[in-house]
């Protein structure tokens, strides 16, 4: 089955090993994911892309035990899904949003995993909120919980992020790597919105990159230089330089405070008044300020 939006094509390939009911659930799920992805640029990041869904053993709690993005002439997102998973269960799972978010940048597929996984980890929560699966409160709670998991991953505390990221597949440190990257993108998003009084955002900055270079295959240093150049800011490269040598996840509390978010007993609380409320809501809804 194919989905078409704004002249762009998404091929959906579902294994015939799924029942007809499961196939309907899977197409409904992909339709929700692809709709959420459109909230970033107003269109999909690729003109022609595909998703391939195969059955996974139904012997665990995770409805999507494995997924990956394969870059190529046609970018492909591959999911292995439990045959018993329903559409609502799939929509509540973070995995689909995470994998689709990888397509937001023209990444060459190697180096600086913290950057690409951080992008996907940040946007997986934002996209869930924008699709209506979770509310704004839950989105910030999920981000807080993620940063806490990253802070608890102390095995490589004191080692530079770039080094931990390079060795992650062999040695571990996934939470430190992923959530340091998610901090990078939250920090960039908030600074862009604050400093431009809402004229800029991470969505808009990445859209400029997509417009320029969607068909390119760029390294992360290339990407951050392009983001600064295209958006006429001094932010992405300097923040990259800061993060890659960081020896722990930077403090998220000042960012949360600037958005009117406090934490008590592990639960986020959202202030309803103050200068950060509109910015906070804009991130969750995708609405330009």
Predicted regions mapped to residue ranges:
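Hydrophobic/aromatic-lined pockets within catalytic cores
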Residues: 38, 42-45, 101, 105-109, ...
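Juxtacatalytic substrate-recognition/specificity segment
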Residues: 2-112
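Beta/coil-rich, acidic/histidine-enriched accessory regions frequently appended to metallopeptidases
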Residues: 212-289
């Amino acid at each position: 089955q194919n989905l078409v939006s704004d002249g762009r094509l998404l091929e959906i390939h579902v294994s015939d090993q799924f029942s007809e009911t499961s196939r309907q659930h899977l197409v409904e799920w992909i339709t929700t994911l692809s709709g959420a992805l459109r909230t970033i640029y107003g269109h999909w990041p690729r003109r022609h892309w595909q998703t391939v869904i195969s059955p996974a053993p139904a012997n665990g709690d995770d409805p999507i035990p494995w997924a990956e993005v394969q870059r190529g002439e046609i970018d492909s997102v591959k999911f292995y899904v439990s045959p018993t998973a329903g559409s609502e269960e799939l929509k509540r799972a973070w995995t689909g949003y995470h994998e689709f978010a990888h397509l937001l940048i023209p990444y060459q597929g190697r180096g600086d995993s913290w950057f690409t996984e951080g992008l996907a980890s940040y946007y997986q929560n934002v996209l869930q909120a924008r699709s209506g699966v979770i509310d704004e409160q839950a989105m910030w709670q999920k981000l807080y919980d993620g940063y806490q998991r990253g802070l608890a991953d102390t095995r490589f505390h004191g080692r530079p992020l770039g080094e931990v990221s390079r060795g992650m597949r062999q040695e571990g440190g996934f939470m430190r790597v992923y959530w340091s990257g998610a901090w990078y993108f939250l920090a960039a998003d908030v600074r862009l919105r604050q400093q431009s009084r809402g004229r800029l955002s991470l969505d808009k900055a990445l859209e400029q990159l997509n417009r320029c270079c969607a068909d390119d295959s760029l390294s992360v240093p290339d990407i951050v230089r392009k983001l600064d150049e295209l958006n006429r800011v001094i932010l992405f490269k300097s923040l990259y330089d800061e993060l890659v040598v960081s020896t722990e996840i930077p403090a998220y509390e000042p960012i949360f405070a600037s958005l009117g978010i406090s934490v008590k007993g592990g639960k986020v609380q959202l202030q309803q008044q103050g200068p950060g409320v509109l910015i906070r809501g804009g991130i969750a809804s995708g609405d330009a300020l």
